[in-house]
Regions:
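Secretory targeting signals
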Residues: 1-2
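Carbohydrate-recognition beta-sandwich/jelly-roll modules
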Residues: 37-266, 363
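Aromatic- and carboxylate-enriched substrate-binding clefts and catalytic-loop regions
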Residues: 264-481, 515
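Residue-level signal for short, function-critical loop segments
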Residues: 237-239, 318, 500
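N-terminal export signals
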Residues: 6-27
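Cleaved targeting-peptide boundary
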Residues: 28-34
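Active-site-proximal substrate-binding groove within the catalytic cores of carbohydrate-active enzymes
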Residues: 177, 188-196, 234, 244, ...
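A generic structural motif
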Residues: 116-119, 262-272, 530-540
Length: 567
């Protein structure tokens, strides 16, 4: 059992300084429109050349009228107005249900050699610069590179639609999915602010990484960031749910021993395994009022962890339906998940998080909410996102993105100043709500190839979001005897010097003198803010081996003696 998906299937710039090089900082003050745009840059602040809308009565191609308003039949209209450095997209449809908007700008895009998009939630080892593929859906933003310039196009964080891009030789298209679950959106008299389209022209000689990081900062005006670098332990990749009060205390003691003695204290996180449903009584799944019998006095245990010198954290699954939940609370797509549009469900989530905060947890990692809503992992969502035939309890009057926004706002409000890690969250919608985001799928304490694929890839291709959207979490170093230390220590070294967060899972029988020395060195580095790691060969591979770390170029060997395991 090496992944959380395996387990599921088996059981049915802030106070934290970015310390960026001057070139990166200067690159953030770029205007979005120029009188003479550089080669290959598409001006997306102008009116699109085509606007069409997929409705419950068919696809309508709208006609541009006065005042940047595109008009169709039955009162259907789309506004495309430039405001505050963006093209703001507004939707009105008093009579027709709407599935998706398509906006297209005709412009030559075939001068670019490579293209990079983002992911709906986490990366799955599948992020990469690729040559032109017209049907490739790229969530949230797309960067283009022609060998000199890196141009970028996207929507600001906090969009009210699930947005993706497609690029072909003759133009660039934005698709905005405004469905409510799988049902056409019924707006009535409401006007939906769909998204804000932004773009950034590249400059020579900035690298593609510097350009994309600057664009990520442009897309998110107000990231919520922790006051200090985040580092510590999480027990999942050695315990895999077989944790207890004793292992929690032991982990806290060990991470404190390995960490520097300054005021930025390490975290000790109990992952999945402490809650009632993972104890002897399986009927407690989805309840969080108390811990299971393995943690008989959780509030007292939390106090002991703090006395040891660690900051306690815990895992939480907000949309898991308790067996006692009434049918009215359950999601139409899957009754095992809660429907967050139900007021009582939001009250339950708020009460759960308030309780965990009052117990004394300094960090809460909430998980599974995207899977519980859509019924698909990020790599399965594609352009359809979810299966057909369902909507939310409140009716199809709000987009799925709006429902997610309400859920995240509920979590944030209840957590107050407790740090939040979003795992399996919609990254572009979580920015500004949560301090940290798991940017890739699970690494492993049993399979090196999985850590190599998921961890290295997600760090390389989403480190551009570090400090711009949130603190990026490329996942843990699973310190166990199942993975050769010669390989794992490289992942540890990269993460510790990356400027992102560092968590380790520490199997007691895998901690020899060499491991302890390497871990102590890594914790000392990670506890102080470092410059963001820049992958140097990321345009040639999905798992970069050459990196710029703390101002120096480094090379890693991820292959080991055996190379990658079969997929």
């Amino acid at each position: 059992m090496s992944t959380r998906r395996d387990f599921l299937q088996g059981t049915i710039v802030s106070a934290i300084g970015l310390s960026l090089p001057t070139a990166v900082v200067n690159a953030t003050s770029v205007t979005t429109r120029r009188t003479s745009p550089p080669r290959g840059f598409a001006d997306l602040l102008r009116a699109p050349d085509l606007v069409s809308v997929d409705t419950n009565s068919g696809i309508q191609r709208l006609v541009l009228g006065a005042g940047a308003r595109w008009q169709g039949a039955s009162g259907l209209a789309v506004d495309t107005r430039e405001t505050h450095g963006a093209l703001r997209i507004g939707l009105m449809s008093p009579a027709l249900g709407v599935r998706r908007l398509h906006l297209r700008w005709r412009t030559r895009m075939d001068t670019a050699r490579l293209f990079l998009g983002d992911a709906w939630e986490r990366g799955y080892g599948d992020l990469e610069w690729r040559s032109l593929a017209p049907d490739r859906a790229m969530p949230w933003y797309v960067a283009t590179w022609d060998g000199t310039f890196t141009h970028a196009y996207g929507v600001r964080t906090g969009a009210k639609a699930m947005c993706f891009w497609q690029v072909d030789p003759a133009g660039i298209s934005l698709f905005a999915d405004v469905r409510s679950g799988a049902a056409p959106l019924q707006l009535g008299d409401r006007t939906l602010s769909v998204c804000d389209v932004v773009s950034r022209a590249g400059h020579a000689p900035e690298s593609a990484f510097v350009a994309l990081h600057a664009f990520c900062k442009q897309m998110c005006a107000k990231p919520r960031l922790p006051a200090q670098p985040v580092y510590g332990s999480n027990d999942w990749y050695y315990a895999y749910g077989r944790n207890s009060a004793e292992t929690f205390l032991r982990d806290a003691e060990r991470i404190v021993e390995l960490s520097p003695a300054h005021d930025n204290r390490p975290f000790a996180v109990i992952d999945d395994g402490w809650q009632p449903g993972r104890g002897a009584d399986k009927s407690g799944a989805g309840t969080w009022e108390h811990a299971n019998e393995k943690f008989p006095d959780l509030p007292g245990l939390i106090t002991r962890v703090k006395t040891i010198g660690a900051r306690p954290g815990a895992w939480y699954r907000p949309l898991e339906a308790p067996t006692s939940a009434p049918a009215s609370w359950r999601l139409a797509r899957d009754p095992n998940a809660l429907d967050p549009t139900v007021p009582e469900v939001r009250e339950k989530i708020s009460a759960d998080l308030t309780r965990m905060r009052e117990w004394g947890f300094d960090l809460i990692k909430h998980d599974y909410s995207t899977y519980d809503l859509f019924g698909r992992w990020g790599f399965e969502m594609g352009t359809s996102l979810t299966k057909n035939g369902w909507t939310f309890s409140s009716g199809p009057n709000r987009t799925t993105a709006e429902v997610i926004d309400d859920l995240y706002a509920t979590i944030r409000s209840a957590a107050r100043n407790t740090l939040i890690i979003g795992c399996n969250t919609v990254s572009h919608l979580s920015a500004g709500y949560f301090e940290m985001c798991r940017v890739g799928d699970d690494t492993s304490g049993t399979e090196w190839s999985r850590t190599w694929k998921m961890g290295v890839n997600s760090l390389a291709f989403r480190a551009t979001q570090q400090g711009a959207f949130y603190t990026a979490d490329a996942d843990c170093v699973g310190v166990t005897n199942a993975i050769p230390w010669a390989l794992n220590k490289q992942w540890l070294d990269l993460l510790s010097r990356s400027g992102t967060m560092l968590f380790v899972s520490l199997a007691p029988d895998a901690l020899g003198a060499e491991q302890k020395a390497d871990l102590a060195r890594a914790m000392a580095i990670a506890s102080v803010q470092q410059p963001i790691a820049e992958p140097l060969d990321w345009q040639r591979t999905t798992s970069p081996e050459r990196w710029r770390l703390m101002g120096k170029d480094r090379a890693f060997d991820w292959s080991g003696e055996e190379g990658a395991a079969p997929g």
